[in-house]
Amino acid sequence: MDQKAIDRVQAHLKRTFGNPHIAVLARPKQKDSAEVELKGEFIGVIYEDEDEPGSYMFEMAILAEDLE
């Protein structure tokens, strides 16, 4: 993802979740995705949607230990 796309997605996530601590960071070796962090902690990955240009998918794992 280029920086313009990262900035747009980051702004959208901050607005949608009402949280200014969300950061979207480029992945140096991956051109089609970016990492998402909350207060410096990795929470998921944003991928460019291959079928829908300009759209993205957010993937977040929730571990059993996180639910305790």
Q: Where are the regions a protein language model picked out?
A:
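Terminal leader/tail segments of proteins
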Residues: M1-E68
